[in-house]
């Protein structure tokens, strides 16, 4: 095989842990793992380690959890490992210029989009919401900008009409490690061919918010259906009914014109709850009232039919 590289891995969530797992099976030497500090989680707010930390400790790897890499003493942790390359996957901390320049081959990042489209924090969700036909992963050389570095390798996959952010996340978590291992081989062999990003094609994937997930009935039915898939499983699209949030898990588009005001309930039956939008009709198929499990529209109508009287408006 190619030269075995000394690698520092930096990542935090499950998506990153899958890449670390692939690295550990690749024959390269992972000399240290950086991940975010343990965070309170669950009802008891008990401190919980990240998925990357759990895996790293299982494998007996040195783990470092600085709050920031700006202090000199934390940068020294990186320098002391004398790595050939640092692999960064959903780490969540900014790498200062000094850190980016420490490894012999620099730092590379696995990003969940086909750059330069969807730089930023939420590329998977934004690609779905925008109605993109495909997405993928880009392995890039990191610089001080936000996802602005030269592209080293790309792998693409189609976005289907059934994909949610959850299913797309899983697809990219399979593609990412493949692209990463290939890129490391090219770096070790000296065959990598960096490609500068075309700044005229840049779009930004801004971070999601719970308020943004509130359904805006003035949008088209097609936009809302994509939004529902893009925000599943987090933060989940929702509508307020009698003062409480009701999450919408699944919906379909009925391509029929209506003169009813956006948000007007048109029908509520075993086929779903049909609501007028800014363009077309959205058919709500699976919903989740606060404190309950997700259920079909039919099951919700059996217990809460008064919520969905035709002619009433959802706001």
UniProtKB/Swiss-Prot annotation:
A cellular component annotation (GO) from this entry: cytosol
Domain of life where this protein originates: Bacteria
Natural source organism: Escherichia coli O157:H7
Keywords: Protein biosynthesis, Transferase
Binding site for (6S)-5,6,7,8-tetrahydrofolate: 113-116
Transmembrane parts of this sequence: none
Catalysis performed (reactions): L-methionyl-tRNA(fMet) + (6R)-10-formyltetrahydrofolate = N-formyl-L-methionyl-tRNA(fMet) + (6S)-5,6,7,8-tetrahydrofolate + H(+)
PANTHER family, alphabetized: METHIONYL-TRNA FORMYLTRANSFERASE (PTHR11138), METHIONYL-TRNA FORMYLTRANSFERASE, MITOCHONDRIAL (PTHR11138:SF5)
Region (C-terminal domain): 210-315
Name assigned to this protein: Methionyl-tRNA formyltransferase
């Amino acid at each position: 095989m190619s030269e075995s590289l000394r690698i520092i891995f930096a990542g935090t969530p499950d998506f990153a842990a899958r890449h670390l797992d692939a690295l550990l099976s690749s024959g390269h030497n992972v000399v240290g793992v950086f991940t975010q500090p343990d965070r309170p989680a669950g009802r008891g707010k008990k401190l919980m380690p990240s998925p990357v930390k759990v895996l790293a400790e299982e494998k007996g790897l040195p783990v470092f959890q600085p709050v920031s890499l700006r202090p000199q003493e934390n940068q020294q942790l990186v320098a002391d490992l004398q790595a050939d390359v640092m692999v960064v996957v959903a780490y969540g901390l900014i790498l200062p210029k000094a850190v980016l320049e420490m490894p012999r081959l620099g730092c590379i990042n696995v990003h969940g989009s086909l750059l330069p489209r969807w730089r930023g924090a939420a590329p998977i969700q934004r690609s779905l919401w925008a109605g993109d036909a495909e997405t993928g992963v880009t392995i890039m050389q990191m610089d001080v900008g936000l996802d602005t570095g030269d592209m080293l390798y790309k792998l693409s996959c189609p976005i289907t009409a059934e994909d949610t952010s959850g299913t797309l996340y899983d697809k990219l978590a399979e593609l990412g490690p493949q692209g990463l291992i290939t890129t490391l081989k090219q770096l070790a062999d000296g065959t990598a061919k960096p490609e500068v990003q075309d700044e005229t094609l840049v779009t930004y994937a801004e971070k999601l918010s719970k308020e943004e997930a509130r359904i805006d009935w003035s949008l088209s039915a097609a936009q809302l259906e994509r939004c529902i898939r893009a925000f599943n499983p987090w933060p989940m699209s929702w509508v307020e009914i009698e003062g409480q949030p009701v999450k919408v898990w699944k919906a379909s588009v009925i391509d029929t014109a209506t003169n009813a005001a956006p948000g007007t309930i048109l029908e509520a039956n075993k086929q779903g709850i049909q609501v007028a939008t800014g363009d077309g009709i959205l058919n709500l198929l699976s919903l989740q009232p606060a404190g309950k499990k997700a259920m079909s529209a039919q099951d919700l109508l059996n217990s809460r039919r008064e919520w969905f009287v035709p002619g009433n408006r959802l706001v």
